[in-house]
A protein has these predicted regions:
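Transmembrane helix-loop-helix hairpins at the membrane interface
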Residues: 87-232, 344, 351, 451, ...
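P-type ATPase nucleotide-binding
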Residues: 448, 452-580, 590, 602-618
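Conserved cytosolic catalytic loops of P-type ATPases
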Residues: 28-47, 55-59, 191-192, 223-318, ...
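Flexible metal-binding regulatory segments at protein termini and peripheral loops
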Residues: 1-122, 134, 241-242, 322, ...
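Membrane-embedded alpha-helical bundles of multi-pass transporters
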Residues: 112-117, 149, 168, 410, ...
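Conserved ATP-binding TGD loop and adjacent catalytic N/P-domain core of P-type ATPases
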Residues: 1-2, 18, 509-511, 544, ...
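Juxtamembrane coupling segments of multi-pass membrane pumps/enzymes
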Residues: 198-260, 291, 418, 592, ...
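Soluble-to-membrane junctions at the N-terminal ends of transmembrane alpha-helices
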Residues: 77-97, 123, 143-166, 325-358, ...
């Protein structure tokens, strides 16, 4: 199933988005299509075995009145958008300079005499407004005709019909002395709407300009991430010389020199030197991080104080930074479930508005005697124009994507990678937070506090334990292996090692069975440990104990303790403030779990949970009605992360974490978990607020423009006010989304 991104130009509102999606989805072999209005981007997915012909897609889009090209250079498109915004800004200035005198001429200026039997005041207003109509409004008119000729309707159609109607009526009034065939309603004493037409174009153009600038600001975050990418790297040749080459040409395993002040070009491992690294742009971590030999570094970070040599571990398109950008890009193409309703409404929005405008206009023309100084025909024209221009499909089209772009972008700047709209939606609804103890509440690096020998010496116990644990990546295994290496590098070469999930490891050597693990494993193997449990009672309440056996004989045990993360207590407190129930999962005994839960303020825990039991526990919570966010390391907790409503992998840049989790956090900080859920709630709050505003605006604005208050209050919405309201509605949506830029994560 192939996927392709294309750029679509010429879209102005939600109706355009609906049109493009309809055009492409109706093509043979298309499985799905998603269109993002602010990004001018469409993601197309073909069905299995379909002919993936980009030319057919582009032809169909072109016939629909839009432009398209393969999406390859977002920085170039951003530059073009900036240039378009600048051109639009010039049009706004010229338009307003001409519109303001037009307004005064039609509303306040008295008789200025005549020129060739024409009212000079109205003639000047005609000339000024015509310049605005043809110069500043050209894109609206072109867009409208492209839409009409392709059999669709959009915002441009509404603006074009409204302004053209006002200009034609007013022009007939100005030139009525030369147009004897016109009915008396077009006499030179009739009202003109040059100011309305000019204000409509000026206000909507001003709104579009503000909107364009705001959309550029909304994408700042993801483009700042793109700017982190190094273009070249200094590779170390076999003879020790250094060559500068494009990062695209650097292979895995290549030694790279990174000097002070330079950006690390690719992910890698330090093979020589040590330095302080600025990771602020990748993770939001303000303090420099010290790294030395064998430590991993991420591409996009900056070396601050000393040159280092790294060995690259990833290609340029597979680094953590590249994955971050791809994740953000994918997330920004998502649609909230409510957006499907918006899309259905948008598909019929413009035709319905035109029908309402015509119906209201005809009603006032034939069933009223006018209003104030306006006769029934003039009133009908005002109602028609006002209804057409106040309707705003733009606000509907921008409500979701602008908030999504800003929310996911600002999250990425702080190392909070939200993979899609579903993760945001579920984080908004989350009411239960499930935390794995090891590596989440604790640092995940336990240290040995004591080795107790029963039927062997300590060194022998440690050697057997390290030899068995050599087959495991569990934090306990790493601690035992590291402790053994400090005394000896000798390991027992077992014939076979078996991993017993949630219990421990069993090794076989010359028909002899060795085991390391918890009490249930020992009991399963017939090793008597119950006699020592009372002796270990105090230890078990604060430490993890692993037993070591040979056959049915207990050799001894190893006591280990893992430190709590510095921010654990604060994070739990913040989670409770958000109204979340916090639950701890651990494979430890209940005594240890109880001690830790009391220490961090967690009221509910589940102890002695096997790895496969984590997913079952999450399912159990969901069956009780909980919306569950599961936090783990993305490796040992993959099943639970996948089952949870929101799976959060903490401190992980691994491929497994990126696959398993809905949200990936680059920092090892539990506060980021709470920050991400808070960001999800804030972003979804903006989306819902935007959609509510867009719907309420149209539901109130359109009836007002149709004149529902004329009979009861005598109040009529002038076309210029309608245009201002329309422009303001979409601008409000974008600027409301932009307030997310000020969001900050929790920090200790």
């Amino acid at each position: 199933m192939g996927e392709l991104n294309i750029r679509v130009t010429g879209m102005t509102c939600a109706s355009c988005v609906a049109s493009v999606e309809s055009i492409v989805s109706n093509l043979e072999g298309i499985d799905s299509v998603r269109v993002n209005l602010p990004l001018e981007k469409a993601t197309i997915r073909w069905s299995e075995g379909a002919n993936e012909d980009l030319g057919v897609v582009r032809d169909a889009i072109s016939k629909g009145g839009f432009g398209s090209e393969k999406y390859v250079d977002p920085k170039k498109y951003r530059k073009e958008s900036l240039e378009n915004a600048n051109r639009m800004g010039l049009q706004v200035i010229i338009s307003l300079i001409l519109t303001i005198p037009t307004f005064f001429l039609t509303m306040f200026v008295g008789d200025l005499g005549q020129i060739y039997d024409l009212d000079s005041r109205l003639l000047i207003a005609f000339i000024l407004s015509s310049i605005v109509y043809f110069y500043a409004g050209i894109e609206f008119h072109k867009g409208a005709w492209q839409a009409i000729l392709s059999g669709r309707a959009n915002m441009d159609v509404l603006v074009h019909i409204g302004t053209t109607t006002a200009m034609i009526w007013s022009s007939f009034v100005v030139f009525s002395p030369y147009l004897d065939f016109l009915p008396s309603v077009f006499s030179s004493t009739a009202h003109v709407f040059f100011d309305g037409a000019a204000f409509i174009i000026s206000f909507i153009l001003l709104g579009n300009w503000l909107e364009a600038r705001a959309k550029l600001r909304a994408t700042d975050a993801v483009f700042s991430l793109m700017d982190l990418k190094a273009k070249t790297g200094s590779i170390v040749n076999a003879d020790g010389s250094v060559s500068e080459v494009p990062v695209e040409e650097i292979l895995r395993g290549t030694e790279i020199l990174v000097k002070v002040g330079q950006t690390v070009p690719l992910d890698g491992i330090i093979v020589k030197g040590s330095a302080s690294i600025d990771m602020s742009m990748m993770t939001g971590e303000s303090n420099p991080v010290f790294v030395t030999e064998n430590d991993s570094v991420m591409g996009g970070t900056i070396v601050l104080d000393s040159a280092i040599h790294i060995k690259s571990t990833k290609y340029h398109d597979d680094t953590v930074l590249a994955n971050v950008i791809n994740l953000v890009d994918e997330a920004q193409m998502g649609k909230a479930p409510i957006q499907k309703l918006v899309d259905r409404i948008s598909a019929v929005f413009v035709p319905v508005v035109v029908a309402c405008a015509v119906l209201a206009s005809l009603t006032w023309m034939f069933f009223s005697e006018g209003h104030g100084d306006y006769n029934s025909t003039e009133l009908a024209i005002m109602v028609l124009v006002s209804t057409l221009v106040i309707a705003c499909p733009c606000a509907l089209g921008l409500a979701t994507p602008t908030a999504l772009i800003v929310g996911t972008g600002v999250g990425a700047q702080y190392g909070l990678l939200i993979k899609g709209i579903d993760a945001l939606q579920n984080s908004y609804n989350t009411n239960t937070l499930v935390l794995d103890k090891t590596g989440t509440l604790t640092v995940g690096a336990p240290s040995i506090t004591n080795i107790k020998s029963i039927n062997s010496d300590e060194n022998n116990i440690l050697e057997i334990a390290a030899s068995l644990e050599s087959a495991s990546t569990h934090p306990i295994a790493k601690a035992i292996s590291q402790a053994h290496l400090e005394n000896s590098e000798k390991l027992i070469s077992f014939d076979r090692i078996e991993n017993i999930g949630g219990m421990g490891l069993v090794g076989y050597l010359e028909d002899q069975e060795y085991a390391i693990g918890n009490q249930p494993l020992m009991e399963r193997k017939g090793v008597l440990v119950s006699n020592y449990i009372e002796e270990l009672a105090d230890v078990l309440s604060i430490s993890t104990v692993v037993f070591v056996s040979k056959g049915k004989k207990l050799l001894g045990w190893i006591e280990m303790k893992d430190k709590l993360r510095e921010t654990t207590n604060l994070a739990i407190s913040k989670a409770k403030e958000l109204g979340l129930e916090v639950i701890m999962l651990t494979g430890d005994r209940a005594e240890t779990a109880l001690t830790i839960s009391k220490e961090v303020g967690i009221l509910r825990f589940e102890a002695e949970v096997k790895p496969d039991g984590k997913a079952e526990f999450v399912k159990k919570l969901q069956s009780e009605g909980a919306i569950v966010a599961m936090i783990g390391d993305g490796i040992n907790d993959a099943a639970a992360l996948a089952v949870a409503d929101v799976g959060i992998a903490m401190g992980a840049g691994s491929d497994i974490a990126l696959e398993a989790a809905d949200i990936v956090l680059l920092r090892d900080d539990l506060l980021d978990v709470v920050s991400t859920l808070e960001l999800g709630k804030a972003t979804m709050g903006k989306i819902r607020g935007n959609l509510a505003w867009a719907f309420v605006y149209n539901l109130i604005g359109i009836p007002l423009a149709m004149g529902v208050l004329i009979s009861s209050t005598g109040w009529l919405l002038p076309p210029a006010f309608a245009a201002g309201a329309m422009a303001l509605s979409s601008v409000c949506v974008v600027f409301n989304s932009l307030t997310l830029r000020s969001w900050k994560p929790f920090r200790a």
